[in-house]
């Protein structure tokens, strides 16, 4: 197969940042994807509907000419988010989810939730109003090994949460383990999961063997090869609760290549071609449209996009870096190739 045409896809987990970074990365997504769930972990975080509205306007103002892209905004959950803010979010028409960052779990998560018990009334309001909770699924206790954080989160936080709030819709974002796949398969229909390019294409050996490769460093961290294989099987299975979420996360090159580098992989420059490569290798190109264009919209209760995009099988070079303000942005598979391109 040399060409495939899909319903225009959506990205259900995206970091756009702000300012010069926003201006650099937004065109990569907006020219291919119809919509994206926009992460709220700015500095300061987007914790109110008014802040989300202002951020949305900055995104719309930065769109390239001719782009028809809708940013789906989120709120950053804190220990003190009031139920009234959830009511306002649900009525806004542009806030589509609330994001749970356990405090200290990833980039700009210091203001995150320290104890989910403090959020029970807020979570109940979300369940009542049908506003999904997107979760970064890791515990952050010092005694838990970084490679085990996700499994602990399932047992200690996610499953009890799902059982306590029987109507709450939950998106288990950027899953990385066989344990997460197994959990999703037996979870209620109101629990979905996103899968990233890097977790489907790479394991921890890519990051650590033969030298540390900081541009593979992300959170949740890359896992074992058997976990990667389980993720590929899940993504390509056609299961309706696994869907595309890149977690594309830009950082300046200098912030990645340092003694204490930032977590995040930038994949938006070729996200859909990367997923096509993954699905082709699995013999499942016929299921790419469901994963990329249908499942996420269906889970969020939004209409599927009405237009389409076409991919062509053609080896396409990837730049070593993109200019970004006074620094540069190193993309996933920098200096290499991807087997598909959007035409």
From Swiss-Prot:
Cofactor(s) it depends on: Zn(2+)
GO molecular function, one term: dihydroorotase activity
CDD domains associated with the record: DHOase
Any GO CC annotation of this UniProt entry: cytosol
Keyword field: Hydrolase, Metal-binding, Pyrimidine biosynthesis, Zinc
Pathway: Pyrimidine metabolism; UMP biosynthesis via de novo pathway; (S)-dihydroorotate from bicarbonate: step 3/3
Enzyme class name: hydrolase
Stored InterPro entries: Amidohydro-rel, DHOdimr, Dihydroorotase_CS, Metal_Hydrolase
Subunit structure: Homodimer.
NCBIfam families, per database record: pyrC_dimer
Family: Belongs to the metallo-dependent hydrolases superfamily. DHOase family. Class II DHOase subfamily.
Annotated protein name in UniProt: Dihydroorotase
Provenance organism: Alkalilimnicola ehrlichii (strain ATCC BAA-1101 / DSM 17681 / MLHE-1)
């Amino acid at each position: 197969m040399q060409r495939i045409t899909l319903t225009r896809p959506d990205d259900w987990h995206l970091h756009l940042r702000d300012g010069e970074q926003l201006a650099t990365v937004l065109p990569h997504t907006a020219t291919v994807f119809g919509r994206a769930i926009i992460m709220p972990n700015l500095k300061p975080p987007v914790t109110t509907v008014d802040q989300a509205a202002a951020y949305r306007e900055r995104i719309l103002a930065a769109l390239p000419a001719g782009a028809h892209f809708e940013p789906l905004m989120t709120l950053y959950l804190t220990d003190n988010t009031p139920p009234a803010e959830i009511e306002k979010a649900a009525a806004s028409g542009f806030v589509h989810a609330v994001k749970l960052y356990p405090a200290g779990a990833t980039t700009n998560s210091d203001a995150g939730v320290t104890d989910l018990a403090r959020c029970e009334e807020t979570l109940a309001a979300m369940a009542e109003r049908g506003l999904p909770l997107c979760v970064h699924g890791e515990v952050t206790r010092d005694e838990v090994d970084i490679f085990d954080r996700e499994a602990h989160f399932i047992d200690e936080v996610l499953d009890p949460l799902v059982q306590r709030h029987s109507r709450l819709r939950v998106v288990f974002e950027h899953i990385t383990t066989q344990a997460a796949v197994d959990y999703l398969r037996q979870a209620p229909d109101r629990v979905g999961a996103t899968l990233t390019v890097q977790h489907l294409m790479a394991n921890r050996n890519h990051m650590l063997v033969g030298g540390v490769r900081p541009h593979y460093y992300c959170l949740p961290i890359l896992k074992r090869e058997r976990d990667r294989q389980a993720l590929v099987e899940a993504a390509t299975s056609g299961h309706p609760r696994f869907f595309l979420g890149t977690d594309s996360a830009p950082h300046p090159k200098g912030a990645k290549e340092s003694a204490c580098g930032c977590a995040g992989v930038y994949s938006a420059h070729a996200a859909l071609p990367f997923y096509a490569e993954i699905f082709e290798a699995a013999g499942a190109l016929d299921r790419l449209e469901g994963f990329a264009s249908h499942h996420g919209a269906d889970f969020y209760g939004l209409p599927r996009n009405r237009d389409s995009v076409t991919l062509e099988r053609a080896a396409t070079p990837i730049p070593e870096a993109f200019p970004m303000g006074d620094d540069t942005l190193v993309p996933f598979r920098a200096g290499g190739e991807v087997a598909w391109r959007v035409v």
